[in-house]
Amino acid sequence: MSLPFLRTLQGDRFFQLLILVGIGLSFFVPFAPKSWPAAIDWHTIITLSGLMLLTKGVELSGYFDVLGRKMVRRFATERRLAMFMVLAAALLSTFLTNDVALFIVVPLTITLKRLCEIPVNRLIIFEALAVNAGSLLTPIGNPQNILIWGRSGLSFAGFIAQMAPLAGAMMLTLLLLCWCCFPGKAMQYHTGVQTPEWKPRLVWSCLGLYIVFLTALEFKQELWGLVIVAAGFALLARRVVLSVDWTLLLVFMAMFIDVHLLTQLPALQGVLGNVSHLSEPGLWLTAIGLSQVISNVPSTILLLNYVPPSLLLVWAVNVGGFGLLPGSLANLIALRMANDRRIWWRFHLYSIPMLLWAALVGYVLLVILPAN
């Protein structure tokens, strides 16, 4: 293990917090470390590994610099650029999933900082909120939707129709907030920025490897897909493999183990046993609250054991993606890629009010809209 890798872990406060939480939970549940590897969602870990390699490959190719230069020339004001990036993040998340959308828009946003004066952290926060709002529209936008859609019996179009009111309300709210938080002042460009030199061969290689990886995911052969992607970069551009933030994978592994330990707590098991008897407001608040603690995908998996895949459930777990950092794994991905500690607390200044508003508006819509 390299010294830079160790130094990164030593400075990673969130990872250290997860370790401390895991140690604390171990005192209240049976100590069975042999079961911990099974608690890790290896499909997610492998998928993230491939996406991180591919994104880093495009970044090191210099293509984001080329694309960023074209973008800043097209948008005259900070507000227009921010609105475009938020809409792009939301749109991409509807068919590429929220995580993949972030792996595209966040590196591009970071590149824009070198070309012009923009509040990068604020824009990344809005992009994280945008993929949570946009991805809830379609059955393939995020993992919780995939799970519930598979059990609901709804058609693709039918699922979109039931999610459209909430998605529309959240996107309208986010765009209005974006309009208020990003000024309409003219873009200020950095002087002396050299014309970017990019590597077309590496870009095309990334595109080819991306197609291979997506095909492998489609056929449930994600491990072989990762092997091919890693081998390709090892041969073509070894720097890509060495530049990836591999500590993010350890953070996810620690989160999965902590969630596993948390669900073993007798108190939580007792609460879950009564979920099927809750009223609609009670289930709404329970699903949202549980998502804040263990993330919305594990919450969905747990709750589907006790309640049917209803409209209320799918809306609640998607609303639960806002708020606290653990609400959605997409939040963690976006903030980690920003590589700035200040963004962690600033994120909650926007995300928590968004959660409260989404919980209120979502439940009102459930009450006033005709039942499906």
Swiss-Prot record:
Broad class of the protein's primary localization? membrane
Report the Pfam families cross-referenced here.
CitMHS (PF03600)
Membrane topology per record:
Multi-pass membrane protein
Cellular component GO terms, alphabetically?
plasma membrane
Is rRNA-binding included in the keywords of this UniProt record? no
Q: Where in the cell is it found?
A: Cell inner membrane
Per its UniProt entry, which superkingdom is the organism in?
Answer: Bacteria
Q: Which GO terms describe its biological process?
A: transmembrane transport
The entry's keywords:
Cell inner membrane, Cell membrane, Membrane, Transmembrane, Transmembrane helix, Transport
Q: Which CDD domains match?
A: YbiR_permease
TM region(s), chain numbering: 14-34, 35-55, 86-106, 123-143, 156-176, 209-229, 248-268, 284-304, 310-330, 349-369
Cytoplasmic topological domain: 107-122, 177-208, 269-283, 331-348
Q: Which residues lie on this side of the membrane: Periplasmic?
A: 1-13, 56-85, 144-155, 230-247, 305-309, 370-372
Transmembrane helix listed as a keyword: yes
The Swiss-Prot or TrEMBL record describes its family as follows: Belongs to the CitM (TC 2.A.11) transporter family.
Question: How is this protein named in the record?
Answer: Inner membrane protein YbiR
